[in-house]
Amino acid sequence: MSVFGGEGQTQGQFQQSLNKVFLFYGGGFAAFVILLAVLEQMGMPKEYIGYAFLAATVLLYGGIGVMSRTNDAAEYYVAGRRVPAIYNGMATGSDWMSAASFIGMAGTLYLTGYGGLAFILGWTGGYCLVALFLAPYLRKFGQFTIPDFLGARYGGNTARLIGVFAAILVSFVYVVAQIFGVGLITARLTGLSFEVGVYVGLAGILVCSFLGGMRAVTWTQVAQYLILIVAYMIPVVWLSVKHTSNPVPQVAYGYLLEKVTAKEEQLLKDPKELEVRGIFKARADAAAEKLKDVPAALAADREAATKKLEELKAANAPEAEIKAATAAVAALPKDEAAAKAAYTAARTTNTARAAPPLRHAEPFPGKDDAARDISRKNFLALVFCLMIGTAALPHILMRFYTVPSVREARESVAWSLFFIFLLYFTAPALAVLVKFDIYTLLVGTPMDQLPGWIARWNVVDPTLMSVSDINKDGILQLAEIRLGGDIV
């Protein structure tokens, strides 16, 4: 299709036609979102809204893939080297805003506070390295892939084979995380099982990339970026307005950070919180004690669980209690190796949950100067590693083969940084807004009055969100919340 291929057009005409297409697309997307919002207000079930979003996006990406089909090698592998810098920057931003950024960035900042800024600094710093040292030279050599570049630059097949191996290894590890994110989002929005969500995502990827290669992927990613940034910004703006009446979360969250800091000091001294953390500490100590003699501990656990089950049956206890006791017996480790692994995991988990929460705004936390110095060094080392890793990602570097010139390669990196900045500048605000919500609206709530979304997330994946009344007081404490970063 000429609108995505630019056949018979000058570069200027091609960009003008793209501007019209994506302006029309943006208007259509806005109208679609407004329509679904109206239908929701009219009583349309949320599951149907999730299905509508999923179907619309899969059809959209598949349609772009079909319209971008090509048999030309240059079009298939490097989109004809005609992608304007701004659109390549948008596609690169979409390519980069993967599960780690879109799903996990705010969660990482929520869980680690100041320490999470290492990811933002490292990832954005990596693009500076790309702009200065990599993108222009990759485009100058004019190959199709990174292994092609290595083969042309260093000669022979040895460098090429090393590049192939590294690209496959890195891409495989990277794709696993993305597929997990696809399954997670699909399961949450539509109610489909996680496994079905993974296959739906894989089918969409196949349709949008198989026929058109890099050309199809490029224009699909441009369309994706608009959806991603809108989907990310809307809830953050809504939370900002809700808590501060300010629609600019990047400005407003400083005010809430002060409140979060004050609430943290209160929770660190709260007697109920200390009680719950003490229970976790006792559980960790018990697990550590079991690890000293695993066979004896396993035998004692089996005897206690079996005895409890027999007592419940003898007393004609409620069926639910008998089922729970039966499940507890069945869940016991089958052998000493499994028992050792279970006790080790229990010790690790309970030790972590017994620790006081990190202060969100505290840089380089540690119990003494030596620990804080180690934390500082780890922060800087992480920034450095992330910079180098970002600059070497194969799927990012390949994007700079698609621009018309070396100059536009540099410009597209600048545009990439801008489009990524929009999300990364918002992620710290989202982390603080969510933490303020958790501290003020969830902590202290009676267990029988908790919002329904907690149970729904527990069904999707208990490691993402689960609560339990550890001290049996009927009130939810912060230490009783198990929250995974991906849920934020």
Kindly label every feature range from the protein language model.
Residues 41-53, 111-121, 186-196, 368-383:
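Interfacial loop-to-helix junctions that mark the boundaries of transmembrane helices
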Residues 32-33, 53-70, 95-103, 123-134, ...:
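Central hydrophobic cores of alpha-helical transmembrane segments in multi-pass inner-membrane proteins
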Residues 12-29, 93-94, 114-212, 237, ...:
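Helix-loop-helix module between adjacent transmembrane segments
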Residues 2-87, 207:
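N-terminal alpha-helical transmembrane segments of multi-pass membrane transport
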Residues 3-15, 35-44, 64, 108-112, ...:
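Membrane-water interface regions at transmembrane-helix termini and the short interhelical loops
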Residues 63-64, 75-143, 295-306, 310-326, ...:
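Membrane-interface helix-loop-helix modules in multi-pass membrane proteins
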Residues 38, 64-69, 172-175, 179, ...:
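Hydrophobic alpha-helical segments and their helix-loop junctions in multi-pass secondary transporters
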Residues 21-26, 45-71, 144-171, 177-187, ...:
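Membrane-interface loop-to-helix entry segments
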